């Protein structure tokens, strides 16, 4: 049977970046891997981030977005039926923005998927310096995306102190408690710089499994809480782009911005931008498109647009 692994987490938490490490490890084990991602955006950023691992043993498929959850789930079922015929050993899915993880378990038990697939690992990605002043809806999403995880993997741990990582885990456990979930995390949290992950680290993640956990359901449209705004081909000089990023985080009228990411050029090549309120990184990438994505709660496009004007 084909094993399905889920990688969950907030928008901008680092799920796609972790997929690069995880999928590469699987290919090195001799498995044929398919990454199934959600094509919600105006630009397929995931393809850009994953381009260096795609090849004979690692493929990517997408499910078109822009529809209601029921339609999206039907499309997912259809896609999984198609993938079952293509000889993959592992399928990695990023399900957030579609439905709760426990609802995905139900899909895998539907015929004929139950004959071809088995549930593998649920891996939750959480920022090591997780924002802790979340709305009740966002705290619920944090709890629901981690409750069934076999392991939590902290992103950007190299930028956090041990005390900050402890605080993040404590806040995660508090969010679980507040949403009626008995699950708690401790030793099952990976707190390591992803660039230093060993085969043993990734083997532990690949064997983490999933947990059965219940929590009180909160019904709302996730897109009303978290949203992402795309700004394409703005062509700001790099020094000005850095200024704009800092301005956006400081301007409360823009909404509650949690992450800014995307791609830009410095004249010599492409750079991948990843910024939070307290840190900004720019790393070379082989090929990309000029796009900046602003992620957060109650975003104000007009206020954000005003900052893009070059001065």
Which functions belong to the PLM regions below?
Residues 35-36, 261-264, 294:
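Short, hydrophobic beta-strand segments that form beta-sheet elements in well-ordered domains
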Residues 42, 148-154, 159-288, 299-302, ...:
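C-terminal accessory "lid"/substrate-recognition subdomains
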């Amino acid at each position: 049977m084909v094993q399905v692994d889920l990688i969950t987490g907030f928008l901008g938490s680092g799920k796609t970046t972790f997929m690069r490490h995880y999928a590469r490890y699987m290919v090195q084990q001799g498995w044929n891997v398919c990454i199934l991602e959600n094509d919600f955006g105006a630009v397929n950023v995931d393809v850009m981030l994953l381009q260096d691992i795609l090849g004979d043993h690692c493929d990517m498929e997408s499910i078109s977005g822009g529809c209601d959850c029921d339609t999206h789930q039907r499309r997912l079922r259809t896609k999984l039926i198609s993938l079952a015929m293509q000889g993959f050993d592992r399928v990695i899915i990023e399900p957030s923005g579609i439905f709760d993880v426990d609802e995905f378990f139900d899909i895998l038990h539907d015929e004929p998927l139950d004959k071809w697939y088995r549930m593998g690992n649920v891996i939750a990605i959480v920022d090591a310096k997780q924002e802790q002043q979340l709305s009740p809806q966002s705290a619920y999403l944090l709890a629901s995306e981690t409750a069934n995880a076999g392991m939590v993997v902290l992103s950007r741990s190299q930028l956090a102190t041990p005390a900050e990582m402890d605080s993040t885990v404590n806040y995660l456990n508090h969010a679980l408690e507040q949403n009626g979930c008995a699950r708690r995390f401790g030793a099952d949290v990976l707190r390591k710089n992803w660039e230093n992950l060993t085969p043993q680290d990734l083997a532990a993640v690949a064997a983490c499994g999933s947990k059965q956990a219940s929590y009180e359901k909160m019904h709302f449209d996730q897109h009303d809480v978290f949203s992402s705004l795309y700004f394409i081909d703005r062509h700001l000089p790099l020094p000005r782009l850095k200024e704009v990023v800092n301005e956006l985080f400081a301007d409360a009228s823009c909404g509650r911005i949690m992450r800014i990411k995307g791609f830009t050029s410095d004249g010599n090549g492409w750079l991948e931008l990843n910024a939070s309120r307290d840190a900004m990184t720019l790393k070379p990438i082989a090929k990309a498109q000029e796009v900046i994505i602003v992620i957060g709660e109650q975003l104000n496009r007009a206020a954000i647009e005003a900052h893009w004007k070059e001065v």
